[in-house]
Amino acid sequence: MSKRTKSILLSLLCFFVLVIGGKFYMDGMKVDNLYRHGYQLFEEQIATYLKEHYSGISKIEFSPIFISGGDGESFVHSRVIPVIYDNYGNKAYLQNGRPLDIGVPRYGTFAGLQLDFAYGGSEFIHLLNDEKEYIQVDQYQHLPPELKLKKDDIMDEVLSIYGKEGLLKGVEKNDQGSPQVEIVYNLEIQRIDERDLDKWK
């Protein structure tokens, strides 16, 4: 085999490696963008409910988007952890076992949020409404008014327990809300082992 032929073959090999690598990179970016779009709407829904239905909250923040298991393209194991601060310097994680071992809901895919790609590669994002029906929202960049929750019985129960246990002070459900609350959204993506969730603070 001549040097010229070897050079051509090597160039072709490098070209194919770059093309394949570029495709994997673009596919990964597409998946990450879907996560960010879906969780942006989901975090807005959670924060809006707390802001409009609870007084005494000074700040609401969210963990990164934690993804665990699968091959990086699975939407099964992903979640965020909302954190609530009262006006007395206390904060409470909406996460089971942190610090109370009670039934705190999971905030993630198939627990209020559905993510996928529709036929043709377009985004597929659904959020739950008050009737516990999944509603398509991928056409929105911000939470539509019709998906502002008016009730969330499980969250209400958890926050009631947090109040009784002294984890949060002065956080009460009412129509006054917390109009001046600081909200810190978080669309950073972290791929982790599920067992490492408790390490985030």
Language-model-detected regions and their locations in the chain:
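Hydrophobic membrane-insertion alpha-helices, especially the h-region
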Residues: 6-23
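N-terminal export/targeting and maturation segments
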Residues: 20-99
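Extracytoplasmic electrostatic interaction patches
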Residues: 98-201
